[in-house]
UniProtKB/Swiss-Prot annotation:
It is an enzyme of class 4 (lyase). GO terms for biological process: pectin catabolic process. The lineage of its organism: Bacteria, Pseudomonadati, Pseudomonadota, Gammaproteobacteria, Enterobacterales. GO terms for molecular function: oligogalacturonide lyase activity. Its main location: periplasm. Transmembrane segments: none annotated. InterPro entries: Ogl_dom, WD40/YVTN_repeat-like_dom_sf. It comes from the Bacteria. Involved in degradation of pectin, which causes soft-rod disease in plants. Pathway: Glycan metabolism; pectin degradation; 2-dehydro-3-deoxy-D-gluconate from pectin: step 3/5. Keywords: Lyase, Periplasm. This is Oligogalacturonide lyase. The keyword Lyase applies.
Amino acid sequence: MAKGNKIPLTFHTYQDAATGTEVVRLTPPDVICHRNYFYQKCFFNDGSKLLFGAAFDGPWNYYLLDLKEQNATQLTEGKGDNTFGGFLSPNDDALYYVKNTRNLMRVDLTTLEEKTIYQVPDDWVGYGTWVANSDCTKMVGIEIKKEDWKPLTDWKKFQEFYFTNPCCRLIRVDLVTGEAETILQENQWLGHPIYRPGDDNTVAFCHEGPHDLVDARMWFINEDGTNMRKVKEHAEGESCTHEFWVPDGSAMIYVSYLKDDTNRYIRSIDPVTLEDRQLRVMPPCSHLMSNYDGTLLVGDGSDAPVDVQDDGGYKIENDPFLYVFNLKTGKEHRIAQHNTSWEVLEGDRQVTHPHPSFTPDNKQVLFTSDVDGKPALYLAKVPDSVWN
């Protein structure tokens, strides 16, 4: 198979056994299919098409699912696609993704013509998820010195990599000219670079590694490399994770948890004043994502975290549910079970993670699960009770 190939899909609809919520499985359970990273754009603006990664052709490539026609068009081919970091352009005309840890690619969604926007220098490796600004004219990413890089194919290697203090740099790439500039370079594992929506001068990034060992995870820096500031000082025994910008740029939301405390806390940072406040207590969700203005949040219940060193202080019962939190009403809703295994699969630590997010109309939640076999894509309906 090759780019442009169309794959017919048969959707499977069922009622969740615990909540009665309508859930639709979009992809077959005998082929690895997964969504992109939860804060990267995956839906067309009108919700009609969905970007995802899949192994229909052997390698993991990008596909575009037409939800009305129930078919998927292959967008990329060959080995080496980072099928988590890719995203759709604001006007739905292109896919951007990184191939072979080196080439930043743009795929025209009409012609499927592909071109290289930027190439990582030979002595560096492109790492993680790269994120564009709101206008999609530039992108921030992380590069790691090639001599320091090791593939992080399981959580043990993830933890070990932290202690190597790899040489990392936060870069900015002009998506028109392909020119790159270094914003920050440190002998410290850096990750999660994200432009603040609507504010190109504010770039967030993190100190990566086991959450209980990282001194301060979240940082802001100006786009020109000035005014680097610590977003918050961790409390004693506190871990912070899975930070994201509310899509309207009003706040950065993150998950906080404490040693010997089974609760999780949804917290919010003001991007200007750095005021840190607790929004609510929640069940043990791993990832969170919001709707456009941050009034609704969705999270995936999880087991004890694997990305800590001292796991003895973080034991919890596995929670298999998806939760929606209405911050206006203060109510919490269990909408459906994801029942995923969270297992590492084919050397990938993320492919079985639900990574839930809302559809553009906020009426459904997209997530990944391997409950029926291999990882597949699902849509769970947001019940009317969430709005009341």
